[in-house]
Amino acid sequence: MNQEVMNLFNPQAPAQTFDSIRISIASPEKILSWSYGEIKKPETINYRTFKPERDGLFCARIFGPIKDYECLCGKYKRMKYKGIICEKCGVEVTLSRVRRERMGHIELAAPVAHIWFLKSLPSRIGTLLDMTLKDIERVLYFENYIVTEPGLTSLKEHQLLSEEEYMIAVDEFGEDQFTALIGAEAIYELLASMELEKIAADLRVDLAETTSDLKQKKLMKRLKIVENFLESGNRPEWMIMKIVPVIPPDLRPLVPLDGGRFATSDLNDLYRRVINRNNRLKRLIELRAPGIIIRNEKRMLQEAVDALFDNGRRGRVITGANKRPLKSLSDMLKGKQGRFRQNLLGKRVDYSGRSVIVTGPELKLHQCGLPKKMALELFKPFIYARLDAKGYSSTVKQAKKLVEKERPEVWDILDEVIREHPVLLNRAPTLHRLGIQAFEPTLIEGKAIQLHPLVCTAFNADFDGDQMAVHVPLSLEAQLEARVLMMSTNNILHPANGAPIIVPSQDMVLGLYYLSIVAEKEPGEGMIFADMGELQHALENKVVTLHTKIKGRFKTVDAEGNPVSKIYDTTPGRMIMGELLPKNVNVPFDICNQEMTKKNISKMIDHVYRHCGQKETVIFCDRIMQLGFAHACRAGISFGKDDMVIPESKAKIVAETEALTTEYEQQYNDGLITQGEKYNKVVDAWGKATDKITEEMMARLKAVEFDPVTGRQKQMNSVYMMSHSGARGSVNQMRQLGGMRGLMAKPSGEIIETPIISNFKEGLTVNEYFNSTHGARKGLADTALKTANSGYLTRRLVDVAQDAIISEVDCGAEIGLTMQPIVDAGQIVASIGQRVLGRTALDPILHPVTGEVIVEAGRMVEEKDVEIIEKAGIQSIRIRSALTCETRNGVCAKCYGRDLARGTPVNQGEAVGVIAAQSIGEPGTQLTMRTFHLGGTAQVVDSSYLEASYEGTVKLRNRNVVRNSDGNLVVMGRNMAVLILDATGKERAVHRVTYGSRLFVDEGDTVKRGQRIAEWDPYTRPIMTEVEGYVEFEDLVDGLSVSETADESTGITKRVVIDWRSTPRGSDLKPAMVIKDKAGKILKLSKGGDARFLLSVESILSVEPGAHVKAGDVIARLPMESAKTKDITGGLPRVAELFEARRPKDHAIIAEIDGTVRFGRDYKNKRRIIIEPNDDTIEPVEYLIPKGKPFHLQDGDVIEKGEYILDGNPAPHDILAIKGVEALASYLVNEIQEVYRLQGVLINDKHIEVIVRQMLQKVEITESGDTGYIPGDHVDRIELEEINERLIEEGKKPGSGNPVLLGITKASLQTPSFISAASFQETTRVLTEAAVAGKMDTLQGLKENVIVGRLIPAGTGGMANQIRRIATARDELIIDERRKTSGSAEANAMLVDMTDNAAE
């Protein structure tokens, strides 16, 4: 009853339902229609009465009453006068809430330009009028006149005239012969007189005629804006404002502070300036003031309105009284504190609390401990309701009193309320979806929340003072979702890689590891036990220890569920662990009959989950945790300083290394080696010494010692156990404690030559301590930067991928990606099985030997299939991928494959984009921030030999080899590869071999694993001859193109080609070597060209003129120094660079066509290379390559499409353009994975593919056809396909386009939803663009829906939307049916009527 009475007084308007939001430019009429009255005075409120001034910025007559149902003068009070307008003060009697909704307006005495359309680049007004921004500003800010109507004079339209020129023109032609205006009126006139249709038609004609690229772009931009205006129905002159809207006063409040001062919103100041200047201008115009004064006032009005809309966009920033810039309307929307991100995307939550967390080892996995005090506060409304229902209280007030007194019945009721009512726990920063999980609360004393130890990994929590927030899901639906989807027991697997995330860590691992140790010569060795009872008995009587080698019977079940048992060689500790394994035929005792390191425990849990299901796994994990803690406690493993053993041989190794460094010093002083070489050698020597000491130390720690008295094995070294089990600590940390700290880096990243010889146990000397401070400081600064950078990367990723949702089951795509194992330096880093697990096969996967089908096309690859695939040695598999999915909005379930967090095929409505973004962003903080400098470091980057990674037979692809004078096989081909085939003839490995490598094997040889196949010099690129003959030099003139340089240290001279273009005399030389026969004729090469070898700068000549050379002999070498010292961008910056699709600094140049290399005429300091195609229909392609870049092609070399002309990191755009989408995908996936793999982070490929899909959504129109697009437009790929299908049906000409790769920021800003783009970055620009085009946001993605406050169209929200759609459709059908039936009834009635009349 009370509810209904309340509603009478406070009618709640029903929430509006809508499907889309449109934004456009407001016309003056529109602004007037919003307004409730004009604001004429700058006053706000009367400082004595605190009542708003009439016609002022807070006027009650315009905006509504200040108190509910009370007019300003107090004549009408209460509900009964609702809607009456007081005749004394003119205020309507209504709710004060209308002061948040009603707008006012200011009539401007002179029009002003809207700064967004003027200054937001590209300037809309400028583009429309085809004038530069500078010129328009000159007119707007009253510096120049502009000719709007030249009449018959010699002036041109849009010509700018200064004051003097205007006067001269008036004198010359007379005032009425032409029109020239100044200020916003002039621009208004120009815009109002534009005939958009005619302009658009003219532009189209010009576009068709123009040939220059630049002009075309300019015309296209203008045409686009003209068309936007035509399509949206906006008028260009609306960009000039004659009326300014004023936002409701309660959105820019004025709050009295104590002491008679006021706190006010900046907007009030800005509006005041506008009103003041406007009123002054009106008065001046009435007084007929001189033009110059009026003009100045108009300019000031323009500036005041500019500041109101976007302060600081033009000219000086307007500051308030306290020298702080005023916050304009634009600033209200922009940035992290703006309306979008602060209030629409991030809202405060009611019913929440936060407290410190402590560990709760006796909790079950689905529980958390909630302090009673907190629970009482959080569940208050529920408690009040229950108290009322049970008759303890009749009013809310009484219930409140009971709760405040904390009466015993309140606690009982709290227990009831809490039972089965899950709460959400959240730990900031929430980097992925496992940062919020649901638990069932259990009440505890104290004030800290208890958290289950196994979920710490997911929350990344520890108990050193972390805090967590608790939220209460209120509605039944929310509770249901929390229980079914977010319960900690439902999140056992990691969404990023599908491995278990509920894995014991630290103490638990240590306990389990200790349980599983096997020791020699323990009491009771060799005993046999029939069941656990006997074993427990023996253990308690100390007949055996946990580590004794025994035989034991392990009981499990077979496939039918009958009990079976088997005897194993094991230890009592392992038997205890085996007891906890679920009884299942697929869970053998072997998985815990091994050393339980963290990796093995994880494997065990995964195995149990895959074979026994979720419930069993949860129970198993809880038990294993209890066991781990119990035994970690019993084992009493602790960290003592004597556990860190310093190896005896340390002093010896250090002395040896010091002797070596002294020797290098001496060699340097004698001039035998350079400074750089000495540095490298010293650093290398110390690096080796550190490693040696570490090895010795680890050997000492690992060593098993026996007690001489009892003969039993002593307990293993505690620290070694901690490290080896994976509980805590690494070899690196142990080395610093017990070995030597080793080499340190300078802040610049270079390595300091003198290492730190001491370790922490011995203590550092002052100098050593000082040297080690650099690295420590850098590490701290790094961490701070890393967090921010990683968060920003995640934000961009989420933004680009938020609308990738699973929207249908199967798109029927017949394209996909080819998966192959990833091999790095001969080692397989990702096997093909790992890569295809949980993906859908595109073609049937066949067994290479028997030909039987392992996986049918369209089926998902499961674990059992992976085993068969790995055994069969399949090397490449075609799979479906999100990248090639053809679903219109979103991705289909078949292309995506398995939902990694559930281990089942993905459900419809799953927001895979956001999950992908989180999976890539979450480990961001673990990546390094640094760029690796490979200048002074000790590692040599380039490997100089190739070893076989498999046994098999050698096959040479594109074989092109010769034997040189030493009798070695030398590779002469640019794109030759060594293949190793297995017995069945399948490729096991493919290795590219570089030009000039020496081969140790030939076609058909068999190789063993680890056998050398080829070697080459990593520091020089050879130039070799492929014909035998006599060398002759061309254009190698001493002093001009060749100089003899003597090596200072060794005194050996070498002849080097120098830059001959630096002197005017040498400008047209082409230094080369030619090979001639005895008669002096130039020999021909196999490809038909002359045997002439052009030499580049810095080549070292290896032969003298007239020397006799054999095929395969080196005639010149090109040192590769420049390539060696490049910085490798690693870690986070590299990932960001790849996702942003930036071109690397020195990027590779890739051949676009197959053909022959020719050298063209050189450019200033660039080399021109032309590729002449093999196919005559294609144009030759030219490339310009900077001189001095190491460059290995010769005139006449044959090159294939996709080969590198110049080495380096390729630009992703080039890969896409030349090799296509699949090559690009595999490049990006592999490059990104490499960065994460270095840090040991596992991420499934499909997440990266989802992001890359979002980057490849657009195509650039090349042929517009009848699509209505302009070449160069970016259009959605699928949209273009749909338009083309329609055009082909109508018999018109379809358009075509090339796929373009957009970086994630660009792609986010190009989403079809302007709301989503505006909330991401560059808010003003996005909104300006959207308003001009009159864009419609159909609210398809997640972000837009959050902003307008609807359920997101993913997950349960997606289902709700679907059900709603079905219901609406059904309603319409029912209504139609009713209409039909009622319609026929009416017709019958009319018939009856007519017959009656006829009868009368």
Curated annotation (Swiss-Prot):
GO cellular component annotations of the record: DNA-directed RNA polymerase complex
Keywords linked to the UniProt accession: DNA-directed RNA polymerase, Magnesium, Metal-binding, Nucleotidyltransferase, Transcription, Transferase, Zinc
Recorded coiled-coil stretches: none
Cofactor note: Binds 1 Mg(2+) ion per subunit. Binds 2 Zn(2+) ions per subunit.
Alphabetical list of InterPro entries matching this protein: DNA-dir_RpoC_beta_prime, DNA-dir_RpoC_beta_prime_bact, RNA_pol_asu, RNA_pol_N, RNA_pol_Rpb1_1, RNA_pol_Rpb1_3, RNA_pol_Rpb1_3_sf, RNA_pol_Rpb1_4
Pfam hit, one: RNA_pol_Rpb1_4
UniProt keyword Magnesium, yes or no: yes
Swiss-Prot/TrEMBL catalytic activity: RNA(n) + a ribonucleoside 5'-triphosphate = RNA(n+1) + diphosphate
Superkingdom: Bacteria
GO BP, one annotated term: DNA-templated transcription
Oligomeric and partner information: The RNAP catalytic core consists of 2 alpha, 1 beta, 1 beta' and 1 omega subunit. When a sigma factor is associated with the core the holoenzyme is formed, which can initiate transcription.
Job description of the protein: DNA-dependent RNA polymerase catalyzes the transcription of DNA into RNA using the four ribonucleoside triphosphates as substrates.
UniProt name for this protein: DNA-directed RNA polymerase subunit beta'
Native source species: Brucella melitensis biotype 2 (strain ATCC 23457)
Gene designation per UniProt: rpoC
